[in-house]
């Protein structure tokens, strides 16, 4: 189950942080590390700061885009330290741990951490089902990357231990949710349909599509429900072709 939980680091700029994150992960039983377009490659400093978790560094998946790191996942949670202009469903670390473990029983889950200085972009955060914020001291809320990973990884482990005590099947998520790849195809299909009907303009699709993403993220349709929505879009396209 824990192997299904990916820790995804976006454009990390310090190899020492990679090593410290690997150590934070392994102490909590997590080993599935993904590096998205790292600005530096893991080196001897990363190995040194991993302190016995060099296998996590050595087995890390290095990819060019966030989409590659999220492929195959049914749940994506992004860390966010500041309020955004576009509200999004929020979790605290404990809720994040519970949801991640429940869903990881069946499909991969991605926990996404942003750049050391600026975090995740709004576009990256919109690829997430939920955002998670750590309730640090508001007068000094400066958590480094490894600290943030440690907090979330601890809550994941606590949730996982609870399932071991209560029986593996007790908290498993049974609802079949679509994978991130399926959702992105749906959003592409939706945008094309709205363009073809004239509901949105080709040079200004962003605001409407952003709000629709938020709507469907909040509703979180099941796989069967998403198929119905795709069928509706296909029917609209057929009607337009017949005109």
Swiss-Prot record:
Q: GO CC: one term?
A: cytosol
Q: Keyword set for this entry?
A: Cytoplasm, Methyltransferase, S-adenosyl-L-methionine, Transferase, tRNA processing
Top-rank taxon: Bacteria
Name the reaction it catalyses.
cytidine(32) in tRNA + S-adenosyl-L-methionine = 2'-O-methylcytidine(32) in tRNA + S-adenosyl-L-homocysteine + H(+); uridine(32) in tRNA + S-adenosyl-L-methionine = 2'-O-methyluridine(32) in tRNA + S-adenosyl-L-homocysteine + H(+)
Report the locations given in the UniProt record.
Cytoplasm
Any Pfam family from its record, for instance, is SpoU_methylase
Catalytic activity, EC: 2.1.1.200
Q: Where does S-adenosyl-L-methionine bind?
A: 79-81, 114, 134, 141-143
Biological process (GO) annotations held by this record are: tRNA nucleoside ribose methylation
- Cell inner membrane recorded as keyword: no
A single GO molecular function, which one?
A: tRNA (cytidine(32)/uridine(32)-2'-O)-methyltransferase activity
Does the keyword field hold S-adenosyl-L-methionine? yes
Q: Which family does it belong to?
A: Belongs to the class IV-like SAM-binding methyltransferase superfamily. RNA methyltransferase TrmH family.
Provide the assembly information: Homodimer.
- Please explain the role this protein plays, according to its UniProt record: Catalyzes the formation of 2'O-methylated cytidine (Cm32) or 2'O-methylated uridine (Um32) at position 32 in tRNA.
Q: What is this protein called?
A: tRNA (cytidine/uridine-2'-O-)-methyltransferase TrmJ
Organism expressing this protein natively: Salmonella typhimurium (strain LT2 / SGSC1412 / ATCC 700720)
Print the organism lineage. Answer: Bacteria, Pseudomonadati, Pseudomonadota, Gammaproteobacteria, Enterobacterales
């Amino acid at each position: 189950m824990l192997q299904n939980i990916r820790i995804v680091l976006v454009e990390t700029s310090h190899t020492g942080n990679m090593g410290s994150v690997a150590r934070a992960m392994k102490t909590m039983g997590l080993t599935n590390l993904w590096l998205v377009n790292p600005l530096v490659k893991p080196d001897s400093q990363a190995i040194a700061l991993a302190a016995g978790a060099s296998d996590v560094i050595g087995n890390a998946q290095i990819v060019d885009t966030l989409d590659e790191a999220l492929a195959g996942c049914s749940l994506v949670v992004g860390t966010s330290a500041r309020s955004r202009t576009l509200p999004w469903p929020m979790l605290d670390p404990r809720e994040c741990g519970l949801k991640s473990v429940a869903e990881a029983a069946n499909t991969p889950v991605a926990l996404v951490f942003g750049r050391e200085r600026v975090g995740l972009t709004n576009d990256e955060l919109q690829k997430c089902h939920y955002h998670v914020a750590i309730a640090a001291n508001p007068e000094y809320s400066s958590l480094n990357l490894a600290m943030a990973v440690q907090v979330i990884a601890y809550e994941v482990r606590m949730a996982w231990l609870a399932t071991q005590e209560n029986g593996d099947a007790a908290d498993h998520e049974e609802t079949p949710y679509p994978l991130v790849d399926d959702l992105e195809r749906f959003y592409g299909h939706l945008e094309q349909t709205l363009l073809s009907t004239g509901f949105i303009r080709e040079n200004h699709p962003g605001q409407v599509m952003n709000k629709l993403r938020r709507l469907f993220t909040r509703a979180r349709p099941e796989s069967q429900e998403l198929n119905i929505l795709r069928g509706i879009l296909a029917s609209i396209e057929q009607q337009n072709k017949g005109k």
